Amino acid sequence: MPKLCVTLALTLGVIGSCSLRAIPILQADIDSLDARAQPYFDEASRNVPAVVDQLTEIGASCRLCGLMVRDKLAGTHETQDYLSSALKEPIIVPCRKGAEVYGCDFESDGFLNILAEVNADYAAIKGYALGGLAIEAIFIRQTVAALTSTLGSVVARLTATFGSGTASAVADGPLPVGDIIAIVMAAGGTAWSGYDLWKARKQLPAELTALLLSVIRDCQDACRREVLK
């Protein structure tokens, strides 16, 4: 019996020792993944100002309004497509590369659920998925939300003032930027007030910058949680 007790004690001691050693090894692995992935997420963050400048330039803002009006009237998703083309190479691709370092499967329901745990606002991202990719979905969904928050009153007034015919003319293209601006501004004070223009040129850049940087951080956080689950 004493011999059995000694053997059991030694066994438990070995198990305990292994368990204690596993914690720093796991943390070291995470640190290594972080070091390899961080440059990609940093690249995405550095590209945010240029993307925001592109999306909030007056011509782009008018075109986005036209696309949002058409989507509202026709049930299309052209705003998402437009934003995807603007966000993909400078922001989405680096984030996808960073996620790949962690070995994340961003098409899985598990990763979508983790994103929702990181930020409850991501719970509805499946409806915005392009090709089923969650990383694309969170950027598109959040950017659309920011645009709707800032430009929603413009879109509502354009929808009521012009109707589907002008919405299609604005969105179909190809139209020169000057023509797009002329169509949108044609509604005068009814469709685009001075306050609306101020929001588009002043409020939207700051809001969009903060949002995109937040999504980049949340994306990396979700990747780390995926590894640790």
Feature locations, PLM:
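Terminal export/targeting leaders at protein ends
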Residues: 1-125
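Cleavable Sec-type N-terminal signal peptides
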Residues: 2-18, 140-147, 154, 158, ...
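Hydrophobic membrane-targeting alpha-helices
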Residues: 13-21, 166, 170, 193
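Membrane-engaging insertion elements
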Residues: 26-41, 45-54, 78, 83, ...
